[in-house]
Amino acid sequence: MAKKSLIAKAKRTPKFGVRTYNRCPICGRPRAYLRKFGICRICFRSMALKGELPGVVKSSW
């Protein structure tokens, strides 16, 4: 889990807009962020397997 100070720092508006970065609102992870869903890949996988994300199905071929 991310440090609380880093999560709070990411919520503030930076001096320059380029410095803005996305964090997962559930766990605070800054990497592997999926913009379409607004969460990280780990939270996405767990929520998709639980069926909490509508329209997401596990693929098989």
UniProtKB/Swiss-Prot annotation:
It comes from the Bacteria. One of its GO terms (cellular component) is cytoplasm. Its cofactor is Zn(2+). GO terms for molecular function: rRNA binding; structural constituent of ribosome; zinc ion binding. Keywords: Metal-binding, Ribonucleoprotein, Ribosomal protein, RNA-binding, rRNA-binding, Zinc. Gene3D superfamilies: 30s Ribosomal Protein S14, Chain N. SUPFAM superfamilies: Glucocorticoid receptor-like (DNA-binding domain). Binds 1 zinc ion per subunit. Coiled coil: none annotated. Zn(2+) binds at C24, C27, C40, C43. GO terms for biological process: translation. Belongs to the universal ribosomal protein uS14 family. Zinc-binding uS14 subfamily. PANTHER family: 30S RIBOSOMAL PROTEIN S14, SMALL RIBOSOMAL SUBUNIT PROTEIN US14M. Binds 16S rRNA, required for the assembly of 30S particles and may also be responsible for determining the conformation of the 16S rRNA at the A site. Part of the 30S ribosomal subunit. Contacts proteins S3 and S10. This is Small ribosomal subunit protein uS14. The lineage of its organism: Bacteria, Pseudomonadati, Thermodesulfobacteriota, Syntrophobacteria, Syntrophobacterales.
